[in-house]
């Protein structure tokens, strides 16, 4: 079997296609969550705290400056505001995935309905069997 035909077999399998669709949807969902956190959730929280822009929060370890030759030296800072935004994004994505997995588990783990009892055909067959037994016992 050639490599091309093996690759076709591999790529056509349902799991690979499902995985590819999941990756594309996940990437799009990540962008939606990023926009939700950065543009909708964090601005009101920042406003409530006192007009704080979380994306600009940082601990400055060394401020920006100019060296002896006049060259700009950038600041050295730990941007914890971006970290807070990322943590909020993670929590939202993790919660959404939790809900999705819970829904999938509920659908796939449904217990089949309990049998309602024997069908009419089974009852009829039982009557025939019992009748044949009785006839055999009477004649024997």
From Swiss-Prot:
The chain crosses the membrane at residues 16-36, 84-104. GO terms for molecular function: mechanosensitive monoatomic ion channel activity. One of its GO terms (cellular component) is plasma membrane. It is a multi-pass membrane protein. Keywords: Cell inner membrane, Cell membrane, Ion channel, Ion transport, Membrane, Transmembrane, Transmembrane helix, Transport. It comes from the Bacteria. It is found in: Cell inner membrane. InterPro entries: Mechanosensitive_channel_CS, MS_channel, MSC/AndL, MscL_channel. Channel that opens in response to stretch forces in the membrane lipid bilayer. May participate in the regulation of osmotic pressure changes within the cell. Belongs to the MscL family. Homopentamer. This is Large-conductance mechanosensitive channel. It comes from Xanthomonas oryzae pv. oryzae (strain KACC10331 / KXO85).
